[in-house]
Amino acid sequence: MRPLSELDPEELIRYISESPKRTIAKFYVKTDDPEGLAERLEERLEDAKVFTGVDHVIVIGEHDDVVEVLESEDSVEYYHKELDHRNRAVPLADYSEFEDVRIEPGAIIREKVKLGKGVVVMMGAVINIGAKIGDGTMVDMNAVVGSRAEVGKNVHIGAGAVIAGVLEPPSAKPVVIEDDVVIGANAVILEGVRVGKGAVVAAGAVVTEDVPPSKVVAGVPARVVKDVDKKTEAKTQIVDALRCL
């Protein structure tokens, strides 16, 4: 299969639909027989990871399968479990695979999105499957970059902004944000919109139509209010120092 970030909508839908739905949980198990319990867990749970302590076992595996085994074990005194999802179709990305990027705690990035060099993803930001983000772009706190969105280089996506994704309907065109665009806090860019190079989207704007390059748009729905001038450039300047690793 091609990389997920290169799949068309129908292929992405098929991938999500056909992916095994998993609920991976971590269990802390108090037991009077850690070695024996660990051995039995490994025998009965093929994909589980088991770690043994002096009087406990830690198990990471499919929730329902682990519970079934633990409930059948007399050596288990009690257990505590941790999980943050249910029937997950697409896992989160392995953040260690991204190079030359900064991902702050609490950011959520799904499997195999594309992040360019120097990308910064702030706390609470969400980047969905199939999205592509160019070099030097910052995704600020609680912003959402939807499925298949294409974001260029040196873009700033403001806090709480939403770049709409396009899996439903599958015929919809993805959002395209060209290079050097600044998107203000809580702005919304709807499906199929292209924002031209160097444009500025004001805070709170709802963009329903394409934005020409080097224009400022504002309002609901967003309308062109002026050209990007020196004053606007000064107010929306991208700071390279914030993208240093």
Curated annotation (Swiss-Prot):
Keywords: Acyltransferase, Amino-acid biosynthesis, Diaminopimelate biosynthesis, Lysine biosynthesis, Repeat, Transferase
GO biological process, one term: lysine biosynthetic process via diaminopimelate
EC number: 2.3.1.89
Pathway of action: Amino-acid biosynthesis; L-lysine biosynthesis via DAP pathway; LL-2,6-diaminopimelate from (S)-tetrahydrodipicolinate (acetylase route): step 1/3
Enzyme class, UniProt record, top EC level: transferase
Pfam families: DapH_N, Hexapep, Hexapep_2
Record's catalysed reaction(s): (S)-2,3,4,5-tetrahydrodipicolinate + acetyl-CoA + H2O = L-2-acetamido-6-oxoheptanedioate + CoA
One Gene Ontology term of the molecular function aspect: tetrahydrodipicolinate N-acetyltransferase activity
Transmembrane segments: none
Role of this protein: Catalyzes the transfer of an acetyl group from acetyl-CoA to tetrahydrodipicolinate.
Family to which the UniProt record says this protein belongs: Belongs to the transferase hexapeptide repeat family. DapH subfamily.
Protein name in the entry: 2,3,4,5-tetrahydropyridine-2,6-dicarboxylate N-acetyltransferase
Lineage of the species this protein comes from: Archaea, Methanobacteriati, Methanobacteriota, Methanomada group, Methanopyri
Gene expressing this chain: dapH
